[in-house]
């Protein structure tokens, strides 16, 4: 079953800690997320990591952040 990714403006989170994911995540770094309602129901986030691929990580490792629209356009990996 394919997960539908809804086309919304890019969302970003800041990594608070990388416990258990030291190779994939850097604390205090901003990451883009992809909407995934099924993952969110399991307290997970679909995050685009250092490799440019999206993976599921525990939502507790991140905090959502609001960015100015101009910065969102600059940081968005896919538009």
PLM regions: where:
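C-terminal structural segments of small proteins and small subunits
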Residues: 56-79
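Short, Lys/Arg-enriched N-terminal segments with co-localized hydrophobic residues
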Residues: 1-3
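Basic/aromatic-rich interaction segments and small domains that mediate binding to polyanionic partners
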Residues: 14-57
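Short structural boundary motif marking the start of a folded domain
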Residues: 7-13
